[in-house]
């Protein structure tokens, strides 16, 4: 990533320090929950980062219509939005020519569980269903799966354990064991199997916008 970056649904801003590269000039975090937006602002004030970190309390509609970004991120956010097609279309209007729109979302509708519903998920995605949301003026650059080990853990939880939500021990196991294993499995499977699906679109032109 480089230049100006927008993250929609930034939560508490935990992604920013890990994803931002030296090429990033400024990072805008959009978060509709005002309490969380305040936490991001507090975090931004504490950290010494080599770029400007801005916070917008609201949705993408709160942005200046003229604002343009070279990268727009939706990390585990799109599944929370009822009208996801309209959301991505509005996001694409804020892309610079040649800019990238990146979506990471939970995969496989058959894994949809009471836990998904309890945290406000409307759906999970397949490659096809995510690609079908390609916004006007954008072309699909890539679409792939992530977290192969997590897929099998989620399947076991759904079919065997039938747990409504993950326990603290399961989350710790996921972070410490499954994530490193997935880094290996994802490469071995050619990024064709995973708990999450990622799509990247590129803005082809600003003509007609």
Q: Which stretches of residues belong to each language-model region?
A:
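Conserved SAM-binding loop
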Residues: 3-113, 199-201
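S-adenosyl-L-methionine-dependent methyltransferase catalytic module, highlighting the catalytic core
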Residues: 10, 14, 60-61, 82-93, ...
